[in-house]
Structures are given as structure tokens and as C-alpha cells.
């Protein structure tokens, strides 16, 4: 039972560890996902439920939490370093790539790619290194994404997300699970669009095996952060989709 979210891969691994008995709180786990939209009571409640469910789940029937985005650095780098130490792979050059939660200004794309490629080669010679190798892939995706403009970056991000969803599915299939649940914004999961979205790429590979349920609204209230990190505000939004308005006028109050 795999739940894959449009959230940072490393941050979602932190959630996965929490729901399997790891330290911290559900709120801290939700914050690790990376986007402010997930720092809600509802997400914390979902994570708490998953942890509670796993406490009594049969072996192989536990809930697993994945992320397929690559826009954050810190958690993936932290877990990669941990894995390297466990597998006795030197992290000296890896340490030089980062300053705090960002790439070091002294290391350009070429340097980062060279270092990460070398680490990946060393990991490939080790048994049980598959998850560590994927952390390298996520970091290489993040590194490349930082060098691109908005339009090019958006297209590449969806390509990377599609690749990451495929990787997640492969991990699950090896354990006898043929289906995963993927959630993300409509523009990413949709099979159609003006560019090669994640959903369009996945539907080409999976054909009828990729099933999408899109959601929309006519009017909604949204609790959003202001420029001050400690303050939030309630904003009202209306959908531009005529079908959403038609549903509202037809009496579907949920819209």
C-alpha cells in the first residue's frame, strides 16, 4: 500500500520513517514534506492515522509514504550521507557540495555532477544500495533543475517526477504490489495538456493502467501564509472552469 505525494522525496522519506515508528511528531513530519500547503491539521491527522495503522499492520501490509518531487535538498542529502556511512562509502567530497540547506556557492553544476556521479558508482558496487542510489538521482535532478529557466524547468520537473513515480512503482512491484496511489496538482497528473506533463508521460507508458481523478471547485476559501511567516489569512478563490460553475449552479453544494 504505497502513497506517493507531490512532495520532496527526502522529506517524504522522513514521513515514511515517522509512520514506521520514527521519532518526532506528526506536525514535524508534515513540515518535512517541503511545501507550506502540507503544513495543515488535515495532513498531520493523515500521517498520525498512517502511523497508528502501521502499528498493527501485518508484514507487507503496512502503509508506505513516498515523495516524487526534487525541489528540496536537505533531507535527501542527509539520508544519502547516512546511507554512505552505513555502506562504507566516503562522503568527504559530498560534504563540500552543501552549505546549510543549499548547494555551496563554490561548487558549480559540473562539480556537483562529477561528485554525485562518483558517489553513485561507488554505491553501485555495494549490496543493498538501491535506495541510496535513488537519493543520488534525486540530488542530481535537483542540481540540474536549479540551472534552468521557469518554462524549461517546469517541463524538466514533470519529466523527473514521471521517472520518480516509475521508480516508486518498481520498488512496490518487487514486493508484490502492482498498484500505487499518486496525488498531485491537476496540471501534473492530467493525461493531457500543452506540454509533456507527468501524467501525460505516465499514461503513455502505462496506457489504461494509469487512471486519473481530477478535482475542481467553483468557490473555495483558502488559509494562506502572508509574507510574515507567523501570520495567515483567509482568501476566496473562484474557478475559471465553466464546468465547475455549471456544477455549482446545478446544486452541487460541495463545489
Show the residue positions of the predicted features.
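The substrate-binding groove and active-site-proximal loops of carbohydrate-active enzymes
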Residues: 29-41, 103-104, 110, 150-156
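Flexible loop/turn segments at secondary-structure boundaries
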Residues: 10-13, 72-75, 187-192, 219-223
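Long, well-ordered, tryptophan-enriched scaffold segments
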Residues: 45, 49-52, 56-67, 71-152
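Trp/Phe/Arg-rich N-terminal binding region typifying the photolyase-homology
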Residues: 1-56
Amino acid at each position: 500500500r504505497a502513497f506517493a505525494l507531490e512532495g520532496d522525496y527526502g522529506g517524504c522519506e522522513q514521513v515514511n520513517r515517522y509512520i514506521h515508528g520514527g521519532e518526532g511528531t506528526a506536525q514535524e513530519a508534515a513540515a518535512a514534506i517541503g511545501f507550506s500547503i502540507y503544513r495543515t491539521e488535515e495532513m498531520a491527522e493523515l500521517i498520525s492515522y498512517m502511523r497508528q495503522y502501521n502499528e498493527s499492520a501485518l508484514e507487507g501490509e503496512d502503509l508506505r509514504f513516498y515523495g516524487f518531487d526534487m525541489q528540496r535538498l536537505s533531507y535527501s542529502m542527509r539520508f544519502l550521507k547516512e546511507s554512505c556511512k552505513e555502506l562504507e562509502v566516503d562522503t568527504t567530497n559530498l560534504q563540500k557540495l552543501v552549505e546549510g540547506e543549499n548547494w555551496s556557492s563554490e561548487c558549480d553544476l559540473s562539480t556537483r555532477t562529477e561528485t554525485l556521479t562518483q558517489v553513485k558508482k561507488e554505491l553501485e558496487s555495494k549490496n543493498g544500495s538501491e535506495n541510496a542510489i535513488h537519493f543520488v538521482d534525486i540530488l542530481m535532478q535537483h542540481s540540474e533543475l536549479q540551472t534552468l529557466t521557469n518554462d524549461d524547468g517546469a517541463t524538466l520537473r514533470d519529466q523527473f517526477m514521471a521517472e520518480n513515480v516509475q521508480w516508486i512503482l518498481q520498488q512496490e512491484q518487487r514486493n508484490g504490489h502492482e498498484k500505487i496511489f499518486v496525488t498531485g496538482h491537476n496540471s501534473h497528473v492530467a493525461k493531457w495538456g500543452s506540454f509533456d506533463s507527468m501524467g501525460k508521460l505516465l499514461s503513455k507508458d502505462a496506457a489504461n493502467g494509469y487512471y486519473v481523478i481530477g478535482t475542481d471547485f467553483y468557490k473555495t476559501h483558502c488559509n494562506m501564509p502572508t509574507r510574515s511567516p507567523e501570520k495567515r489569512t483567509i482568501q476566496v478563490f473562484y474557478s475559471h472552469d465553466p464546468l465547475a460553475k455549471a456544477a455549482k449552479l446545478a446544486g452541487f453544494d460541495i463545489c
